[in-house]
Curated annotation (Swiss-Prot):
This is Betaine aldehyde dehydrogenase. The active site is at K162 (charge relay system), E251 (proton acceptor), C285 (nucleophile), E463 (charge relay system). The record marks E247 as: Seems to be a necessary countercharge to the potassium cations. Transmembrane segments: none annotated. The modification Cysteine sulfenic acid (-SOH) is found at C285. It catalyses: betaine aldehyde + NAD(+) + H2O = glycine betaine + NADH + 2 H(+). The lineage of its organism: Bacteria, Pseudomonadati, Pseudomonadota, Betaproteobacteria, Burkholderiales. The keyword rRNA-binding does not apply. Belongs to the aldehyde dehydrogenase family. The gene is betB. SUPFAM superfamilies: ALDH-like. It comes from Burkholderia ambifaria (strain ATCC BAA-244 / DSM 16087 / CCUG 44356 / LMG 19182 / AMMD) (Burkholderia cepacia (strain AMMD)). Involved in the biosynthesis of the osmoprotectant glycine betaine. Catalyzes the irreversible oxidation of betaine aldehyde to the corresponding acid.
């Protein structure tokens, strides 16, 4: 018997059975307990979801922007009222500590919906005078039906981030959560319906990558917003372009540099580094996993990091005292342990962790100890490839030019940060780093107002911020002639 029972698809404002006849299981990564059986969508189910979305989108787009704004604000209120309930589900599904999901996941998702609800009425065109008797005006119109494909690390937050600008602009969305963490997207669908979003405007289809491919290649989808790995992102872009030249937004992987200069407050720098590597058990795309420290302060910095790692409270995610939980799945655990083994084999110095935790209740979960490597080199696998787990690599440097060149020597470009008391150096360095999200003397916050996304192979487009709203609309240009028409023939 599973905790949450059979989970169905959400199409047309309510739950429906999938036609595939297939289900998949989702488990609690802390205990191995079966959480739910989830119905897998078929191609016919995806077609049904898209058709429902097309119908609902016409009704939604016909509303005034103020009407849409009010409905989205009601959804925000419902999310906040149910914060504790949703956080409990998210903790069971992801393995995140309850203190984290209560404070972050639903809260930040609701914040983004509230932000775009406020911007819905500000979607405006332009008026351009040509001459005394002629002018051009532009309209920003919704794209139509969009697809959202979520990642497993922030299930409900990502669903909110993708739906908020899409719905605010008058679009509908068919959303596929990760099959690893599929539960809370369905709760968001219930909330949107209760808030007054018309049937079909937000549909949820479940399944593996084959379902994502059906959405990406669907001729009636106008845009795909994807969060996930680089290789999958390339496939999404290829299929989206080949099928119908869809608009694409992608937030992909990272191997982000955190640079600690010799004048940094080392206590602050250590706090930042530990957060940038071990928050959410290291399963954050923006993690600052390449920690470059000036050689003159490396030992003092490393000592401070190790002191803080000892204070990390690994435990049951449902325990309020826990601030570090398991990895999301057995597959992710195996991947992370493989990277740790490669670090040892390539000569990195293991300073902390480096093992799976199996004592007591840890034995049934996917736990790995917070891990710190020193004496790392740029050519090591743990330094070059995204791990997506709690593994910090400490590297030293001598000069500003050197560290910038090394920090940029990667095909990723998602995030970067510097810690220094010299503001001129901070801005100078940040301006030279090839990354889309940057922090100075802090790490990790991504407020609704801040556009987030990557350079290079870390993504295309942005999520959050005003600029994202524009990419959920298309521009129609209209010339108006008030004077005499001069015939050509």
């Amino acid at each position: 018997m599973s905790v949450y029972g059979l989970q169905r698809l959400y199409i047309g404002g309510g739950y429906v059975d999938a036609t595939s006849g297939k289900t998949f299981d989702t488990f609690d990564p802390a205990t191995g307990e079966l959480l739910a059986q989830v119905q897998q969508a078929s191609a016919a189910d995806v077609d049904r979801a898209v058709a429902s979305a097309r119908e609902g989108q016409r009704e939604w787009a016909a509303m005034t922007a103020m009407q849409r704004s009010r409905i989205l604000r009601r959804a925000v209120d419902l999310l906040r009222e149910r914060n504790d309930e949703l956080a409990a589900i998210e903790t069971r599904d992801t393995g995140k500590p309850i203190g984290e999901t209560l404070a972050v996941d639903i809260v930040t998702g609701a914040d983004v919906i509230e932000y775009y609800a406020g911007l819905a009425t500000a979607i405006e065109g332009l008026q351009v005078p040509l001459r005394a008797e002629s002018f051009v005006y532009t309209r920003r119109e919704p794209l139509g039906v969009c697809a959202g494909i979520g990642a497993w690390n922030y299930p409900i937050q990502i669903a909110c981030w993708k739906t908020a600008p899409a719905l605010a602009a008058g679009n509908a969305m068919v959303f596929k959560p990760s099959e690893v963490t599929p539960l809370t997207a369905l709760k968001l669908a219930e909330i949107y319906t209760e808030a007054g979003v018309p049937a079909g405007v937000f549909n949820v289809v479940q399944g593996d990558g084959s379902v994502g491919a059906l959405l990406t290649g669907h001729p009636d989808i106008a845009k795909v917003s994807f969060t996930g790995g680089v290789e999958t992102g390339k496939k999404v872009m290829s299929l989206a372009g080949a099928s119908s030249l869809k608009e694409v937004t992608m937030e992909l992987g990272g191997k982000s540099p955190l640079i600690v200069f010799e004048d940094a407050d080392l206590d602050r720098a250590a706090d930042i580094a530990v957060t940038a590597n071990f928050f959410s058990s290291g399963q954050v795309c923006t993690n600052g996993t390449r920690v470059f420290v000036h050689r003159s302060v490396k030992d003092a910095f490393t000592q401070r990091v190790l002191e803080r790692v000892k204070r990390i409270r690994v435990g049951k995610p449902t325990d309020a005292a826990t601030n570090f939980g398991p990895l999301v799945s057995a597959a992710q655990l195996d991947k992370v342990l493989g990277f740790i083994d490669s670090g040892k084999a390539e000569g990195a110095k293991l300073l902390a962790g480096g093992t799976r935790l199996t004592d007591g209740h840890f034995a049934s979960g996917q736990y790995v100890a917070p891990t710190v490597f020193g004496d790392c080199r740029d050519d090591m696998k743990i330094v070059r490839e995204e791990i997506f787990g709690p593994v910090m690599s400490i590297l030293d440097f001598e000069s500003e030019d050197e560290v910038i060149a090394r920090a940029n020597d990667t095909h990723y470009g998602l995030a970067a940060g510097v810690v220094t008391e010299n503001l001129s150096r901070a801005h100078r360095t940040i301006h030279r780093l090839e990354a889309g999200i940057c922090w100075i003397n802090t790490w990790g916050e991504s407020p609704a107002e801040m556009p987030v996304g990557g350079y290079k192979q870390s993504g295309v487009g942005r999520e959050n911020g005003i600029t994202t709203l524009e990419h959920y609309t298309r521009i129609k240009s209209v010339q108006v002639e008030l004077g005499r028409y001069n015939p050509v023939f």
